[in-house]
């Protein structure tokens, strides 16, 4: 952008399963492979395709769109303005705004009219006119998949250029179970939500159905361009390879993790000084 005057990477976030077998394997416990040759548990466990081990594939991905109404024109308008998000499979919903928002919000968040009137939605750029006391304020909200696992934490990922090098920093901004990010490390406490690998059961009383907060960048420099996007993590749950192993009485693979944390990502907001 400094050299050409525009940003060719100003994209919205989308995701998909990249499946070639006419199935929609969005659930880890219902994964049926992607390309036909990995249609059985045996082939998924030890097979490969184009020099990639089948066991390394993620089960799925979904695209989400924040449209004003459920019509074809409204959906395409939302995609053009990049008010979209991506998930690793579950129907988690997430949204991100930047603007003149109050210091704190309830977990149910702010009204849509307030969000749009006092700020800009994900996928857009924001300038100094939206700063409060020379600080950028972001509102982020997420709600769990109603048939999925509870949420563990909300994060903001910040990126900026410094001395010609791209820098990134991850901030935990909202934590589950009444905890809060550490003021120095900006990290939530480690999740205590356990997964029983003998049957893939999880602790249902851990985590939140929704998370929301207004966050202010503690290292904000109003003269420095930056991007921000939100990420939300579910509590840990079994990966599809673990489900295959349990159903076939196989040992767990040591080349992939037994559990994962499903997640969703918002489109970025770009700060332009």
Predicted features and spans:
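C-terminal functional module detector
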Residues: 1-273
């Amino acid at each position: 952008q400094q050299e050409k005057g525009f940003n060719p990477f100003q994209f919205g976030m989308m995701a998909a399963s990249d499946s070639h077998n006419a199935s929609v394997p969005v659930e880890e416990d219902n994964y049926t492979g992607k390309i036909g040759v990995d249609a059985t548990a045996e082939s998924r466990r030890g097979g490969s395709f184009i020099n990639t081990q089948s066991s390394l594939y993620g089960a799925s991905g979904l695209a989400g769109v924040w449209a004003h109404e459920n019509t074809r024109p409204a959906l395409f308008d939302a995609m053009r303005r990049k008010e979209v998000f991506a998930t690793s499979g579950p129907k988690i919903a997430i949204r991100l705004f930047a603007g003149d928002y109050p210091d704190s919000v309830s977990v149910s968040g702010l009204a849509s009219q307030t969000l749009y009137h006092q700020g800009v939605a994900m996928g857009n750029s924001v300038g100094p006119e939206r700063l409060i006391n020379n600080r950028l304020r972001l509102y982020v909200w997420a709600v769990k998949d109603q048939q999925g696992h509870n949420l563990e934490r909300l994060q903001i990922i910040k990126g900026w250029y410094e001395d010609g090098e791209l820098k990134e920093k991850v901030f935990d901004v909202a934590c589950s179970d009444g905890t809060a990010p550490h003021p120095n490390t900006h990290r939530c406490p480690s999740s205590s939500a356990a997964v029983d690998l003998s049957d893939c059961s999880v602790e249902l009383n851990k985590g939140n159905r929704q998370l929301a907060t207004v966050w202010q960048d503690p290292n904000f420099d109003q003269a420095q361009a930056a991007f921000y996007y939100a990420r939300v993590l579910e509590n840990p749950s079994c990966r599809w390879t673990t489900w295959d192993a349990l159903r076939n009485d196989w040992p767990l693979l040591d080349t992939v993790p037994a559990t994962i944390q499903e997640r969703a990502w918002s489109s970025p907001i770009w700060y332009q000084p």
